[in-house]
């Protein structure tokens, strides 16, 4: 998939007062705890009209999860046919290009990834968003986390989701742990690989200092609520960061809408 930085090809009503595109590219429509409350693409499109937000429906998977093979990917893509929504896939791991064909991946509007499924020293994955995750040596964790993030950003993806997220136990040390050198290393990787940095409303990341540094380096940004059904369309944090850090329409990534065929 070739990444294109394009103007927001949206109707005039989907722009903010600062002329920024009102696009939520991190919207999950399935509620695993309450499946009956899950949304259809048509319902999402209707909600977008009500909220004045264009949605990117983000499926999850790769070689496992909801999207785990070509059949499940095609089913997801076909479910959005005829709806004014973007189609995205949040991938996990690094083997997903082996499980999903290039032909089907090209039917997506964008692919995102994050570093929150983190390899522990014992070889087991650590799910960084869980509440009881702790690291005895925060500095050692950060060195490994930054290196792993750079690896994630080297993939053929368009959006870095949940950027600079830290486990709950380390959030109070965010400014100290995300040193200028560490920030610059991941920013340089994002810019080099043309990956947009998500302004994430759920986790309220990244920081303004990070956004300013990334803008100075020529990075692009995207808006994402990172919500499941309830709360999708909330891009307030991203809009606030954009205003605070002087982002303009040209700084914001909006996908090229591809045919569902």
Residue spans of the language-model regions?
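Charged catalytic cores and adjacent phosphate/nucleic-acid-binding surfaces used
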Residues: 2-13, 18-23, 174-261
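Alpha-helical transmembrane segments and their juxtamembrane interfaces
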Residues: 14, 36-38, 119, 172, ...
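A metal-dependent hydrolase metal-coordination microenvironment
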Residues: 19-143, 147, 229-232
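Conserved, mostly hydrophobic/aromatic
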Residues: 26, 111, 162, 197, ...
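Alpha-helical scaffolding segments of alpha/beta enzyme cores, especially the outer helices
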Residues: 43-46, 71-79, 103-106, 147, ...
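Short loop/turn motifs at secondary-structure junctions
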Residues: 51-54, 107, 155-159, 246-248
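Short secondary-structure transition/capping segments
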Residues: 71, 99-111, 133-142, 166-167, ...
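Domain-core and long-helix interface of multi-subunit machines
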Residues: 115-118, 125-219
């Amino acid at each position: 998939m070739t990444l294109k930085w394009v103007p927001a090809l949206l109707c005039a009503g989907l722009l903010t007062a600062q002329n920024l595109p009102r696009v939520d590219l991190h919207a999950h429509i399935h509620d695993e705890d309450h499946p009956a409350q899950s949304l259809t693409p048509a319902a999402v499109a209707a909600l977008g009209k009500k909220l004045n937000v264009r949605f990117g429906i983000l499926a999850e998977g790769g070689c496992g999860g909801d999207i785990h093979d070509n059949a499940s990917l095609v089913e997801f893509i076909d479910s959005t046919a005829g709806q004014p929504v973007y189609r995205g896939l949040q991938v996990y791991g690094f083997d997903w290009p082996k499980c999903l064909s290039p032909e089907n991946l090209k039917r997506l509007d964008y692919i995102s990834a994050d570093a929150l499924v983190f390899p522990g020293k014992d070889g087991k994955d650590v799910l960084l968003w869980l509440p009881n995750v702790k690291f005895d040596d925060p500095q050692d964790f950060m060195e490994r986390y930054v290196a792993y993030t750079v690896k994630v950003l080297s993939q053929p993806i368009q959006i870095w989701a949940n950027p600079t997220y830290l486990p709950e136990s380390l959030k109070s040390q965010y400014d100290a742990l995300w040193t200028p050198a560490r920030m610059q290393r991941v920013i340089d990787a994002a810019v080099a690989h043309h990956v947009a940095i998500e302004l994430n409303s759920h986790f309220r990341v990244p920081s303004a200092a990070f956004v300013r540094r990334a803008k100075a380096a020529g990075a692009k940004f995207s808006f994402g609520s990172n919500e499941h059904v309830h709360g999708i369309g909330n891009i307030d944090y991203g809009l606030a960061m954009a205003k605070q850090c002087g982002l303009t329409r040209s700084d914001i990534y909006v996908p090229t809408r591809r045919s569902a065929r």
